[in-house]
């Protein structure tokens, strides 16, 4: 999927507001993961891979290292105990990420009963090694918020991946 993002010169005030919380654009899970690699890699965006690579991929500068670090800190607070992302926490590791709950579109615009639940995150925040995006299409269990549906899957998958990759736990993780 190529995704969809209107050209900035065409953004109205209402489009700017909607874009700030994720409406009016579309991205695939791989595109979202690619964007998160810039946060995990000092502002340099990498091409995502599902495989362990023998050589690191070439990156494209996307944002400054300072902005990337600031955003990592913000993402870490998004999984604090009192937030919707708390179910994404991985025991022994500092992680960060963002929940998302997307109303699906139909012929008449946004639906009222069909959702995509999303969690995109980075682990460990102290020395990023993994970007994981969980996207669950049309969850059926009654809950549909990203923090309730996708965040626990992120926690499980990312925790297992960190252990399989022998990433040492953080000493200062909750």
Segments predicted by a language model, with ranges:
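Beta-lactam-recognizing serine transpeptidase/beta-lactamase-like catalytic domain environment
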Residues: 1-139, 146
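Short, gly/Ser/Thr-rich active-site loops of penicillin-recognizing serine hydrolases
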Residues: 56-59, 151-174
């Amino acid at each position: 999927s190529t995704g969809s993002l209107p050209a900035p010169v065409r953004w109205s005030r209402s489009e700017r507001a909607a874009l700030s919380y994720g409406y009016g654009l579309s991205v695939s899970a791989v595109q979202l993961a690619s964007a998160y690699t810039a946060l995990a890699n000092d502002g340099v965006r990498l091409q995502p891979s599902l495989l362990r690579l023998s050589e690191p991929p070439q990156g494209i500068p996307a944002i400054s290292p300072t902005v990337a670090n600031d955003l990592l800190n913000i993402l870490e607070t998004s999984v604090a105990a009192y937030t919707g992302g708390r179910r994404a926490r991985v025991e022994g590791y500092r992680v960060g990420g963002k929940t998302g709950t997307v109303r699906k579109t139909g012929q008449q615009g946004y639906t009222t009963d069909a959702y995509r639940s999303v969690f995109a995150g980075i682990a460990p925040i102290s020395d990023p090694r993994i970007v994981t995006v969980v996207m669950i299409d049309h969850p059926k269990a009654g809950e549909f918020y990203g923090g309730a549906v996708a965040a626990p899957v992120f926690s499980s998958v990312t925790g297992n991946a960190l252990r399989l990759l022998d990433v040492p736990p953080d000493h200062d993780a909750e």
